[in-house]
């Protein structure tokens, strides 16, 4: 499909930066949501990715009216050559995630529970504690209970049933 070179470059840059591309299957959508600032139609994204897929540079998944494209190793090399990028720049999918550099937590509170529980958590905690006392026999308590005489009645609206005895 004929499309402006600036659109193709914008699509390839986003694909290389993220490593993945998502597009809704809607050829009439005026702009792709992630490339709205560059005025790239969704149709151009779909066709550019279809072209890369046919050459084996991306893998395609489709679910719930959305296309998902993942860069392959050959695709990374192709986009590096096409966009004239150095080998140090890699897609976000290949970068290692850093551990969170937040404030270290005090080590004294690891085994303790929080002092204040919400109502739902307190109810759940009480139920778990009082459900079965330690050392109790679960199998002896299971079953129909102490009633030895059972009475079977017909269901509601399923025939006439027997008269009560």
UniProtKB/Swiss-Prot annotation:
Chain positions found as Omega-N-methylarginine: 153
Keyword Nucleus: yes
Cross-link (Glycyl lysine isopeptide (Lys-Gly) (interchain with G-Cter in ubiquitin)) at residue(s): 138-139
Keyword Protease: no
UniProt-annotated stretches for the region Disordered: 92-165
Post-translational note: Methylated by PRMT5. Methylation is necessary for its interaction with NPS1, its localization in the granular component (GC) region of the nucleolus, for the proper assembly of ribosomes, protein synthesis and optimal cell proliferation.
Biased composition (Basic and acidic residues): 97-128
Name of protein: Small ribosomal subunit protein eS10
Organism: Homo sapiens (Human)
Classification of source organism: Eukaryota, Metazoa, Chordata, Craniata, Vertebrata
Gene: RPS10
